[in-house]
């Protein structure tokens, strides 16, 4: 089977997974973990653990030396991964092994600069061959995304763009028209990290975004427990959780304890997106 044909199944798997959650009357649980943290093997084990706990989709972060949109927790994890020598090849391996072990959709979340340096065709081809479902590109402007989208579509990869409360309605329509898979709605202005409340802005942003697209709208940036997950699940198609998982691994006594902690949190959040059932 060709890489492109293989990946089209993976891109469809993402859409099917989100649709299946909706058919069950719930939001999807989407987890974020950086590749190479605490090690490449440890990162793969952590992804398997959150899938075991009940995550529907995982975003694999490509560690960056200047993650300007990420808070201190993810910055710390990225720094550990980079000091460990993580490379794009390790990210691809993480995607491949996580997907092959679970059969679940796995995306990459990355800033644009590493892809630009690596080569768009090379990156998309390798991600497709690894079984990746697509890519989340938080800092790639839609008006500069034509080359990426050409190659992503060629390889059957979803392109997920990020919208924010500051986005005007016309801008939302432009962003959602260019994207695929789902829309990532940033629930609070600023960088990622757990917060006491995900904020009322999130619900309004989801409403405004849905007015422009039939794509699922998934909310991230702030959710860290089942109560918040249930709150967001009441109005969003997916609940994205990252910093809370990473913090548990940073705070754990050892890797085994970290794996158990993220598995347990995924289970708690999975109950949250199901309304506590």
From Swiss-Prot:
One of its GO terms (cellular component) is cytosol. Pathway: Amino-acid biosynthesis; L-tryptophan biosynthesis; L-tryptophan from chorismate: step 5/5. Its EC number is 4.2.1.20. Keywords: Amino-acid biosynthesis, Aromatic amino acid biosynthesis, Lyase, Tryptophan biosynthesis. Gene3D superfamilies: Aldolase class I. The keyword Lyase applies. The active site is at residues 59, 70. It is an enzyme of class 4 (lyase). InterPro entries: Aldolase_TIM (IPR013785), RibuloseP-bd_barrel (IPR011060), Trp_synthase_alpha_AS (IPR018204), Trp_synthase_suA (IPR002028). Pfam families: Trp_syntA (PF00290). GO terms for molecular function: tryptophan synthase activity. It catalyses: (1S,2R)-1-C-(indol-3-yl)glycerol 3-phosphate + L-serine = D-glyceraldehyde 3-phosphate + L-tryptophan + H2O. Belongs to the TrpA family. HAMAP family: Trp_synth_alpha (MF_00131). The alpha subunit is responsible for the aldol cleavage of indoleglycerol phosphate to indole and glyceraldehyde 3-phosphate. Tetramer of two alpha and two beta chains. PANTHER family: TRYPTOPHAN SYNTHASE ALPHA CHAIN, CHLOROPLASTIC, TRYPTOPHAN SYNTHASE, ALPHA CHAIN. This is Tryptophan synthase alpha chain.
